[in-house]
Curated annotation (Swiss-Prot):
SUPFAM superfamilies: Ankyrin repeat. InterPro entries: Ankyrin_rpt, Ankyrin_rpt-contain_sf. It comes from Dictyostelium discoideum (Social amoeba). This is Myotrophin homolog. GO terms for biological process: actin cytoskeleton organization; negative regulation of barbed-end actin filament capping; regulation of barbed-end actin filament capping. Keywords: ANK repeat, Cytoplasm, Nucleus, Repeat. GO terms for cellular component: cytoplasm; nucleus. May regulate NF-kappa-B transcription factor activity. Plays a role in the regulation of the growth of actin filaments. Inhibits the activity of the F-actin-capping protein complex. GO terms for molecular function: protein-containing complex binding. The keyword Repeat applies. Its main location: cytoplasm. The gene is mtpn.
Length: 120
């Protein structure tokens, strides 16, 4: 459990060295979820940890999955206004037409013009 907590902290805080060390020691960490079915890509997108997010995706982490609320990593990044995370997820092929729990698409939910441009 402590290993998962350390990994989660490293992902959220952009500690790429410890993220890599953890994944190299235990690859299945890229597939863990919390009590709301949020995984590492959700956390990285939510905190705009683009380097971590790119690494996780390169190791096979799911980045189009929904949590218990119907939120994908892309929606998490859009809701937080994190252009870098949105740009990476779109580049990697995230579903741009996903609809969030509020009934809005990622494009409709975006408040920043640069994010809207990425989602067109």
């Amino acid at each position: 459990m402590e290993e998962q907590n350390d990994f989660t902290w490293a992902v959220k805080n952009g500690d790429i060295a410890n993220v890599k060390k953890s994944v190299e020691a235990k690859k299945d960490l890229i597939s863990i979820t919390d009590g709301n079915k949020r995984g590492p890509c959700h956390w990285a997108a939510d905190f705009n940890q683009v380097e971590v997010l790119e690494y996780l995706i390169s190791k096979g982490a799911k980045f189009d999955n929904t949590d218990d609320y119907g939120i994908t990593p892309l929606l998490a990044a859009v809701y937080e206004g994190h252009t870098g995370a949105v740009e990476l997820l779109v580049k990697k092929g995230a579903n741009k037409s996903v609809v969030g729990p509020d009934g809005q698409t990622a494009y409709d939910a975006a408040e920043k013009a640069d994010i809207k441009a990425l989602l067109k």
